[in-house]
């Protein structure tokens, strides 16, 4: 029983330390990755390429990813550099 409690404690501790983020996937040009003309599985495969858990083509017609690692770039309106913006 104590091993089980220890296991659960470690599990929750790891879950609190490992943080993931959600957001729009960013291309090399700083713009959101568009998916309007792509196949249905395109966003999910692009999100998994950067170690995200899942993704889909959102209403803005851009790939939205879930549970991406902190090092993965996501689109942010404050740091938007799409089409030369700063």
UniProtKB/Swiss-Prot annotation:
Residues 21-83 form the LCN-type CS-alpha/beta domain. Keywords: Amidation, Disulfide bond, Ion channel impairing toxin, Neurotoxin, Secreted, Signal, Toxin, Voltage-gated sodium channel impairing toxin. It is found in: Secreted. Disulfide bonds join 31-82, 35-57, 43-63, 47-65. CDD domains: neurotoxins_LC_scorpion. Has the structural arrangement of an alpha-helix connected to antiparallel beta-sheets by disulfide bonds (CS-alpha/beta). This is Toxin Td8.
């Amino acid at each position: 029983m104590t091993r089980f409690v220890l296991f659960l404690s470690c599990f929750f501790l790891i879950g609190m330390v490992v943080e993931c983020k959600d957001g729009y996937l960013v291309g090399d040009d700083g713009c959101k990755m568009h998916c309007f003309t792509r196949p249905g599985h395109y966003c999910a495969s692009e999100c998994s390429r950067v170690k995200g858990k899942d993704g889909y083509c959102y209403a803005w017609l851009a790939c939205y990813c879930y549970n991406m690692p902190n090092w993965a770039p996501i689109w942010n309106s404050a740091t938007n550099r799409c089409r030369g913006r700063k």
